[in-house]
Amino acid sequence: MSITKLADKINEAKAEGRLGLIPFLPGGYPNRDQFWKEILELDEHGADVIEIGMPFSDPVADGPVVEAASLKCLEDGINLKWILAGLSEHRAKISAGVLLMGYYNPVLQYGLEEFAKDASAAGVNGLIIADLPYEEGVEFRDLLAKYDIALIPLVGLNTEADRMALYSKGGNGFCYYVSVLGTTGGTATLPEEIKQGLAKAQEVFDIPVALGFGLKEPSQLKELEGLVDAAVFGSALIKHIDSGKSSAEFMKVWK
């Protein structure tokens, strides 16, 4: 396994002339039995990287749809050990890169070294910790790197150029640009300031840049071409599954 796996998968999509697709689903959603079926369908039907949420009781950075889904998973008893055990069982059938996203507390309780070791053994390629400041995460990033796991840097509109440059020194996998998309007349549009921020990120980072901003419809991908290398979507997928449709159907529309 390589620490560059996530970047490699996104760059493969770029070589095909398209954006990398990164669907997000909270671990154990919509239920224990169906979750891995959804993950395998996402992989089979074109996901380049699959992002699995680590449920947490206080998901301060999540929107209402993701938060509600994550809290349901917690109520169902989903935890990190369950996610890693299931991933170990299914990883050989998944060609996409695999990324875990969540908060620091569950990882800290698991034990940092033990987590890194178990996550690597399960086939995790990258990790996003939404509430871990860069300065506090340097040692953890180095620990993860020992196990070929990339700690993904998070940036956004409020990230100054000098801080982006700092993040870029230790960044592996890809840069995750967090944004809230404005809506006008029911059609989501990308504000000019976001476009400028993305241009800055592309200039600073020598790894791919992915945008997570609440994609609602496939037509929005067109607007991102040339601005980012990959797009993350979570709420749209959760709503799709909630409506009784499959992940395979979702990917066919977005691919």
Swiss-Prot record:
A Gene Ontology term for the protein's cellular component: cytosol
State which residue ranges cross the membrane: none
User: What GO MF annotations does this protein's record show?
Assistant: tryptophan synthase activity
The chemistry this enzyme catalyses reads: (1S,2R)-1-C-(indol-3-yl)glycerol 3-phosphate + L-serine = D-glyceraldehyde 3-phosphate + L-tryptophan + H2O
- E.C. no: 4.2.1.20
Its pathway, per UniProt, is: Amino-acid biosynthesis; L-tryptophan biosynthesis; L-tryptophan from chorismate: step 5/5
Q: Which residues form the signal peptide?
A: none
Which InterPro entries does this chain map to? Aldolase_TIM (IPR013785), RibuloseP-bd_barrel (IPR011060), Trp_synthase_alpha_AS (IPR018204), Trp_synthase_suA (IPR002028)
Top enzyme category: lyase
- Write out the entry's keywords from A to Z: Amino-acid biosynthesis, Aromatic amino acid biosynthesis, Lyase, Tryptophan biosynthesis
Gene3D superfamilies referenced in this protein's UniProt entry, alphabetically = Aldolase class I (3.20.20.70)
- CDD domains on file: Tryptophan_synthase_alpha
Q: How does it assemble?
A: Tetramer of two alpha and two beta chains.
Q: What does this protein do?
A: The alpha subunit is responsible for the aldol cleavage of indoleglycerol phosphate to indole and glyceraldehyde 3-phosphate.
Q: Which protein is depicted?
A: Tryptophan synthase alpha chain
Provenance organism = Maridesulfovibrio salexigens (strain ATCC 14822 / DSM 2638 / NCIMB 8403 / VKM B-1763)
